[in-house]
């Protein structure tokens, strides 16, 4: 399922219920409506052959299952304090952090505590062929391992303002 299709479906269901629904509720609705999605995030496809961008917010401890993608994913944490499983490593992610996830790397957020504030993030998906072009332009950048970049207390903090 493409991201745009999922967002349209989510808008329709939210309008019908007259309130925003969580991703977990959306997955239950898919199952109820006869769609078979074992893992909503694993099934996602890019709309573009270059870059897709969207923002995502979790207000509850949605059960996002371990999943991977066929494209690169970058997450910029706008709010929230969660742990993130990247491959076999676990990281504490907080406001201002950037996560870079190569294709095929299993990942998921871990909601170990009650969410005191929503887990809000900007998400950028980058098609592998487009990333290859970027690498040719910028020179060699090792992109086979996940990366967590902290921006708090650095010159990169201006991105949030």
Please name every model-derived segment:
Residues 1-85, 91-92:
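Generic protein-terminus/edge-of-domain signal
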Residues 41-43, 127-133, 152-153:
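Short, functional N-terminal and low-complexity linear motifs
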Residues 50-143:
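N-terminal regulatory/effector-sensing and dimerization cores
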Residues 139-161:
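Amphipathic alpha-helical segments enriched in hydrophobic/aromatic residues interleaved with Lys/Arg
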């Amino acid at each position: 399922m493409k991201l745009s299709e999922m967002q349209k479906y989510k808008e329709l269901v939210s309008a019908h219920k007259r309130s925003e629904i969580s991703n977990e509720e959306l997955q239950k609705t898919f199952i109820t409506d006869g769609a078979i999605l074992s893992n909503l995030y694993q099934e996602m496809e890019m709309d573009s052959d270059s870059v897709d961008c969207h923002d995502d917010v979790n207000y509850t401890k949605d059960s996002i299952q371990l999943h991977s993608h066929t494209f690169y994913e970058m997450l910029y944490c706008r709010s929230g304090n969660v742990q993130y499983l990247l491959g076999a490593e676990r990281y504490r992610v907080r406001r201002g952090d950037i996560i870079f996830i190569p294709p095929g790397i299993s990942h998921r957020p871990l909601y170990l505590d009650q969410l005191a504030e929503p887990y809000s993030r900007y998400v950028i998906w980058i098609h592998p062929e487009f990333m290859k072009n970027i690498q040719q332009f910028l020179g060699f950048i090792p992109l086979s391992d996940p990366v967590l970049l902290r921006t708090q207390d650095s010159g990169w903090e201006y991105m949030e303002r």
